[in-house]
From Swiss-Prot:
It comes from Clostridium botulinum (strain Eklund 17B / Type B). The keyword Manganese applies. Its EC number is 1.1.1.267. Mn(2+) binds at D150, E152, E221. Catalyzes the NADPH-dependent rearrangement and reduction of 1-deoxy-D-xylulose-5-phosphate (DXP) to 2-C-methyl-D-erythritol 4-phosphate (MEP). Pfam families: DXP_redisom_C, DXP_reductoisom, DXPR_C. This is 1-deoxy-D-xylulose 5-phosphate reductoisomerase. 1-deoxy-D-xylulose 5-phosphate binds at K125, S151, E152, S176, H199, S212, N217, K218, E221. One of its GO terms (molecular function) is 1-deoxy-D-xylulose-5-phosphate reductoisomerase activity. NADPH binds at T10, G11, S12, I13, N124, E126, G205. The gene is dxr.
């Protein structure tokens, strides 16, 4: 039996991970789980999965949950805030941690888990975007596996299995193109929140849905792929694939291309990471090629969807520039979701921040500098609104 902690258990990835655990015939067990403030959802999880530990980032929510557990004589231990997240990420009795928190908040507990020598099922892409060098170095030092949960990176991981990385020629990351595929800049002036959240293929959380609409999600995945697979940015290609059947591809030095195909179901890469490459039965819809009918591929429009272009630029510059990119994007997306800025303002804010904070990139890449700069960039974005 494999014992797990899930950071961000009430979100989209966390919820689907629970379904994987439920269908594992007792081979997977939830030991620790964290959420931000969703008390009612966490109560349901306690009742169904009986985790030994739960953590809430919001202290008031933790107090409510603790009261619930005491009144019903539940043995679940309730922890709170970042200290609680870090403890649940590094529990002695667990084997693997799923980090499915959204944003920079996932960095610190991920590092704590790695230091505790826990394998990481990584769904929090921002961790590698801002601190890829630190995370991969720490993972190597502690002999920890970083197992990708993003469908694209899981596809690459699977396509690389059994082959020498030295023979890798190119990584081809596929993207659905989001809800605005084919549109030009002038078509994006009056985009509302509901329009941007309406992803054609994937059922995702609000923040990642907006990132998919701007193509920033693919930009973050480019940086993530660079660190996961030690691949130069010039050898990472993004291809628009609206059917979302080919999850990504790998081109080898002889020109051969290996791809991973499957239904658009996040439970597949989650289960693959949990079982560390061992194939297990999963009751899910499989791919029917008669239904698919055709597979098409297009070049991304980098002039319209500038965030993807900016992500390549930030990744190539390295150091603290990806922290600026990510912090500006997180803050801008939050403002857009609150209907305080327009859709295209997200693009302009990211570029503005990359120019404004250029001098900050001369500082060394440390955890302290990453956290400090992230706060500084986000405050700047909120203040400029």
């Amino acid at each position: 039996m494999k014992k797990l902690s899930i950071l961000g258990v009430t979100g989209s990835i966390g919820t689907q991970a629970l379904d994987v655990i439920k269908k594992s015939n007792g081979e997977l067990k939830l030991i620790g789980a964290t959420a931000n403030s969703s008390v009612n959802k966490m109560i349901e999880i306690i009742e169904e999965f009986n985790p030994k530990y739960v953590g809430m980032m919001d202290k008031n929510s933790a107090d409510k949950l603790e009261k619930y557990c005491k009144e019903r004589n539940k043995q679940t231990i309730v922890l709170s805030q970042m200290e609680g997240l870090n403890k649940i990420a590094s529990l002695e009795e667990i084997d693997i941690v799923l980090t499915s928190l959204v944003g920079m908040i996932g960095l610190e507990p991920t590092l704590e888990a790695i230091k505790a020598k826990k394998d990481i099922a990584l769904a929090n892409k921002e961790t590698l975007v801002v601190a890829g060098e630190l995370v991969m170095s720490e993972a190597k030092k502690n002999n920890v596996k970083i197992l990708p949960v993003d469908s694209e990176h899981s596809a690459i991981y699977q396509s690389l299995r059994g082959n020498d990385l030295k023979t890798l020629n190119k990584i081809i990351l596929t993207a659905s193109g989001g809800p605005f595929r084919g549109k030009k800049l002038c078509d994006l002036n009056d985009i509302g929140v509901d329009d941007a959240l309406n992803h054609p293929k994937w059922n995702m959380g609000r923040k990642i849905s907006i990132d998919s609409a701007t193509l920033m999600n693919k930009g973050l995945e480019v940086i993530e792929a660079h660190w996961l697979f030690n691949c130069d940015y010039d050898n990472i290609q993004v291809v628009i694939h609206p059917q979302s059947v080919v999850h990504s591809m790998v081109e080898y030095c002889d020109g051969s291309i290996i791809a991973q195909l499957g239904a658009a179901d996040m439970r597949l890469p989650i289960q693959y990471a949990f079982n560390y490459t061992e194939r297990k039965n999963l009751i899910a819809k499989t791919l029917d090629f008669y239904e698919v009918a055709q597979l098409t591929f297009e070049k991304p429009d980098l002039e319209t969807f500038k965030p993807l272009k900016l992500a390549f630029k930030a990744g190539k510059q390295g150091g603290l520039m990806p922290t600026i990119l990510n912090g500006a994007n997180e803050a801008a997306v939050a403002l857009f979701l609150d209907e305080k800025i327009e859709f295209l303002d997200i693009f302009n804010i990211i570029e503005n921040c990359m120019n404004t904070f250029e001098e900050e990139t001369k500082k060394p890449l440390t955890l302290e500098n990453i956290i400090e700069l992230d706060k500084k960039v986000k405050k700047y974005v909120v203040d400029m609104k």
